[in-house]
Amino acid sequence: DFGEFYCGVVDLTNPEAFEWFKDIIKEYTLGIGIDGWMADFGEYLPTDDICLYSGKSPMIEHNHWPVLWAKCNYEAVKESGKLGDVVYFMRAGGAGSQKYCTLLWAGDQSVDFTIHDGLASVICGALSAGMMGCGLTHSDIGGYTSLFDNTRTKELFLRWAEMAMFTPFMRTHEGNRPDTNFQYYDDEDTMERLARLVDVYTMLAPYTKTLVEENADSGHPVQRPLFMHYESDAKAYDIQYEYLFGRDMLIAPVYEQDKHEWDVYLPQDEWVHLWTGEEYHGGAITVSAELGYTPAFYRKNSEFADIFEEIREKYGVK
């Protein structure tokens, strides 16, 4: 009982049931031309009062279930000859999911600025996932879950979107209460602001593509903790809410409301502020962080500096 609907769980330990579900994906998803979908749930196997075909305890099988669900999707795509042409994203996973899951998303965050289940939570969530081998992650822009009087604001939506442009996958979601949550189409100003952010995301594509390729080749996540490239910096190990977007960019998302400035920590390097061109050499700094200009920096000697400079020329602070 999900509160608003009922559902059942197919016993994926049963080979016939596994093949049946795989055929459903082939026929009714791939078969009608769909090349991307949300492979939702995966974590709802009951832990008591059921008997599985495998004979294993559901308590033991519970954490393995997301792997079976990912494998079912993966094999459907592979057997249809569409690996590399199809992306499905999942919210549940663990050891073993890495081979079968093409993309993670962070699940159903609250539509707010709370530290443990709002915007901030997807930052450290992406870093944790990346360090366990799931290097391609993203989240619902604006969050998903509205309960009681908790509703998405315009500011939250835009702060989330400005972070999402520095992730491998940028995707909006209306949330579970579309009529009461702020949507990008609610006013012209937001549509213009979002169009700018999406264009930046598009301009970054040559750089982002190399990060995705690196993830496939070496396993390095697209979003990385600072200590991954600055091992000798003791402070880097304490930073949870900033991340390296590949080797050459550092992003410090604004995850609190009503902020116009933001404190940032930069490891020792030659950094250039994406929006102003101001140069920094590392350490603790405070920078302007107006809506739409989340603190973002790139390494001065990056081979992609021309792209970053083009972004500043088109959308930077004049």
Where in this protein do the model-derived segments appear?
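Catalytic-domain carbohydrate-binding cleft regions of carbohydrate-active enzymes
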Residues: 1-309, 315-317
